[in-house]
UniProtKB/Swiss-Prot annotation:
Chief place where the protein resides: cytoplasm
Catalytic reaction(s) noted: L-homoserine + acetyl-CoA = O-acetyl-L-homoserine + CoA
Entries under CDD domains matching the protein: GATase1_HTS
Enzyme class: transferase
Subcellular location: Cytoplasm
GO cellular component labels: cytoplasm
UniProt protein name: Homoserine O-acetyltransferase
Family per similarity comment: Belongs to the MetA family.
Known EC number: 2.3.1.31
Biological process annotations from GO: L-methionine biosynthetic process from homoserine via O-succinyl-L-homoserine and cystathionine
Length: 301
């Protein structure tokens, strides 16, 4: 089923080439079913790439989604054209009196800072507090997951000696959880981060349930408030070449960066990446939308 996005959004052409069903607002308004209102708080500097990654996954479901892109009013984005933000994005102030079926909070390249040092932390806290009563379910990704775990439950993050960078095997910790419907007991997901949250801290919080963990990469999936809050420490939304682009960017800057683990064929960066997370990435997003958004949200928000 389709997702509703602005007809001029650049990601639209990318998605149409991949046979992701997108629809204009004009066409959607002639249908009798209600679209799910999904907000994406995009904290990434690579906004257009992140848009395409997330829309690709949430668009691969039998649901009609009305997508609203959000950016932080208290932060100036240097890596994206301001006319793109003005044309396609709203701020929290624009939507704070509305309710949403779902909210996605992305990662951000600020993890080496303490949460309180991030220039938009106060605004993000207001959004996370708002989500508790105005959003049916919120999916937090990578740093967004660390921020959510810290704000809602006081779970700290810890610096890593080396960047967690690559594609890692994970094991399902809890059976018969709707978010993991259709998951294999072992599955892969990319990680790209300099900090971690620890299993011991998660297990100390009775309101949280650890769903998937990795011996090498650590905590990946956590759920709270019976699905009103979902935390994904990895990047199941990543495209095939995202880790490759990150590696080449840092290498070209002269940074000390290792080749992403378990990613390139024969671990050779001159060969193509091996995608081993795509099916479970689609499952993660479709299960979240189906079981924790669509099945739980009221018809009238």
């Amino acid at each position: 089923m389709p997702i509703i996005i602005d007809k001029d959004l650049p990601a639209r052409k990318v998605l149409q080439k991949e046979n992701i069903f997108v629809m204009t607002k004009e066409r959607a308004e002639t249908q009798d079913i209600r679209a799910l209102k999904i907000a994406i708080l995009n904290l990434m500097p690579t906004k257009q790439e992140t848009e395409a990654q997330l829309l690709r996954l949430i668009g691969n479901t039998p649901l009609q989604l009305d997508v609203h892109l959000l950016h932080m009013e208290s932060h100036f984005s240097r890596n994206v054209a301001q006319d793109h933000l003005m044309s396609f994005y709203k701020t929290f102030r624009d939507i704070e009196n509305e309710k949403f079926d779902g909210l996605i909070i992305t990662g951000a390249p600020v993890e080496t800072l303490s949460f309180e040092e991030v220039d938009y932390w106060e605004e993000l806290k207001r959004i996370m507090e708002y989500s508790k009563t105005n959003v049916t379910s919120t999916l937090h990704i990578c740093w967004g997951a660390q921020a959510g775990l810290y704000y809602h439950y006081g779970v700290p993050k810890y610096p890593l000696k080396e960047k967690m960078f690559g594609v890692f095997e994970h094991e399902v910790c809890e059976q018969h959880v709707k978010l993991l419907q259709g998951f294999d007991e072992l599955f892969f997901a990319p990680h790209s981060r300099h900090t971690e949250v620890r299993e011991s801290d998660i297990r100390e919080v009775t309101e949280l349930t650890l769903l998937a963990n990795s011996e090498e990469a650590g905590v990946h999936l956590v759920i709270g408030q019976e699905g009103r809050q979902v935390f994904a420490l990895g990047h199941s939304e990543y495209s095939c070449d995202t880790l490759k682009q990150e590696y080449e960017r840092d290498r070209d800057k002269g940074l000390n960066i290792d080749v992403p683990k378990n990613y390139f064929k024969h671990n050779n960066p001159d060969e193509k990446p091996l995608v081993r997370w795509r099916s479970h990435g689609n499952l993660l997003f479709s299960n979240w939308l189906n079981y924790y958004v669509y099945q739980e949200t009221p018809y009238i928000l």
